């Protein structure tokens, strides 16, 4: 209510009977300290500039220990749903307090948003939104999503001891899980000693042996029981196992727990074996390193960097011990687009922000604008409501909106929710 100035129609007055005029509610602070910074309000016509703290009850000021925290000494207004006590700062000075009652129409509309059993619950307001409102909110959500992905990448860089090349590979691997196996692929990538693998980068067979071995997929008990007998007579499987045994001893390798991999309701082309073989091919060809990615100035060039297929054995297999119709199993256009969105764009933005080079950040946004919007249930639901979805930037914004606002019932922080509430 305070952030969006959803105030009652009646004049606002403090507990000391001062007339309150809100010029600027301030900047919302999501970290430690007062809730809003640099607010501008007039008390009896005099302009005050400072911080504002929001509480359900005035006594929460003491519950949260603000009376002993000097960071709250410059609070110029304490806004509460109920004023049940006088609040004082660490200097013992009483605070100016304002009881803010929720307008009846706002409360009614908010309860509607919480109770409507349809997604999105604000669907009725969508057709009346201005293009400016939609565009500005989508742009903000797009940047917010990229910033979150950047935080995740920076955490990987830290875990990789500052090695951006390694962190990029972990990010790429995670996105090869295409959601279902994302966590497992990330753990697998951390289990790969890439510096050691580099010594064998000219031998695709050895790379695949290390990649599959570290995934725990060269153990017989990882193969469905009906295929185990065939696998034991499979020369390629035996060669891979023996090669991994040698390399694991050489580099003191320990495989991850294969139970982290999920196969249930997974399309065969998404089986870890297939995706790992594609990654092995990509790694062997030396085309998909960080430097090549940074040099890709167009979506077409980025797709060329990431285009790959499986090794010959996997053209006729989805798992060990079971043959299938020959299929080269290239990455599909759909999969390539997802990798561009979730890996290339994210790495460009994160690396650009890290290095202070705007050209990479700008390129990330250009790629999102050039790529087609994703076609998932979230995007389809918003489109059915009349919201225009023109490119991948828009679809990424809608994913952010659902995950960070709709699913958490954060309608009060959403600009579309604001439009619904103020009706």
Segments and roles (model prediction):
Residues 1-21:
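Short Lys/Arg-enriched alpha/beta "domain-start" segment
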Residues 40-51:
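Active-site beta-strand-loop-beta-strand hairpin of nuclease catalytic cores
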Residues 49-57, 78-80:
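Active-site ExK catalytic segment of metal-dependent nucleases
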Residues 67-71:
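N-terminal nucleotide-handling cores and adjacent loading/scaffold lobes of large enzymes
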Residues 73-75, 79-137:
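Compact, glycine/acidic-enriched structural inserts
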Residues 141-397, 410:
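Hydrophobic, aromatic-lined core segments that form the binding pocket/scaffold
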Residues 396-423:
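Cysteine-cluster motifs in flexible loop/terminal segments that predominantly coordinate metals
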């Amino acid at each position: 209510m305070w952030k969006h100035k959803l105030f009652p129609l009646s004049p606002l007055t403090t507990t000391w009977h001062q007339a309150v005029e809100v010029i600027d509610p301030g900047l919302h602070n999501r970290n430690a300290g007062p809730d809003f910074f640099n607010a501008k309000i007039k008390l009896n016509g005099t302009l005050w500039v400072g911080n504002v703290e929001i509480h359900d009850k005035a006594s929460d000021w003491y519950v949260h220990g603000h009376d002993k925290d000097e960071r709250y000494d410059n609070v110029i207004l304490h806004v509460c749903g109920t004023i049940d006590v006088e609040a004082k700062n660490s200097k013992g000075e009483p605070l100016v307090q304002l009881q803010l009652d929720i307008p009846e129409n706002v409360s009614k509309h908010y309860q509607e948003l919480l109770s409507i059993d349809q997604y999105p619950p604000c669907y009725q307001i969508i057709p009346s939104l201005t293009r400016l409102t939609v565009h500005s909110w989508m742009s903000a959500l797009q940047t917010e999503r990229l910033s979150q992905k950047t935080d995740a990448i920076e955490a990987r860089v830290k875990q990789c001891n500052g090695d951006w090349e390694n962190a990029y590979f972990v990010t790429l691997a995670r996105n090869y899980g295409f959601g279902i196996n994302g966590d497992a692929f990330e753990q697998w990538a951390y289990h790969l000693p890439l510096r050691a693998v580099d010594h064998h980068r000219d031998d695709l067979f050895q790379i695949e042996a290390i990649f599959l071995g570290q995934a725990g997929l060269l153990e017989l008990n990882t193969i469905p029981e009906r295929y185990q007998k065939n696998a034991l007579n499979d020369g390629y499987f035996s060669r891979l196992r023996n090669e991994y045994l040698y390399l694991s001893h050489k580099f003191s390798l320990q495989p991850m727990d294969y139970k982290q991999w999920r196969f249930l309701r997974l399309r065969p082309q998404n089986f870890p074996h297939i995706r790992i073989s594609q990654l092995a091919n990509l790694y062997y060809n030396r085309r998909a390193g960080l430097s090549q990615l940074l040099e890709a100035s167009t979506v077409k060039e980025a797709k060329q960097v990431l285009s790959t297929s499986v090794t010959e054995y996997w053209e006729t297999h989805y798992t060990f011990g079971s043959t299938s119709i020959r299929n080269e199993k290239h990455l599909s256009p759909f999969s390539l687009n997802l990798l561009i969105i979730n890996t290339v764009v994210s790495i460009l933005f994160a690396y650009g922000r890290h290095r202070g080079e705007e050209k990479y950040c700008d390129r990330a946004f250009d790629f999102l604008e050039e790529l087609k919007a994703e076609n998932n249930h979230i995007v389809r639901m918003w489109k059915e409501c009349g919201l225009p979805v023109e490119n991948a930037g828009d679809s990424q914004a809608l994913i952010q909106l659902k995950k960070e606002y709709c699913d958490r019932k954060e309608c009060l922080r959403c600009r579309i929710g604001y439009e619904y509430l103020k009706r």
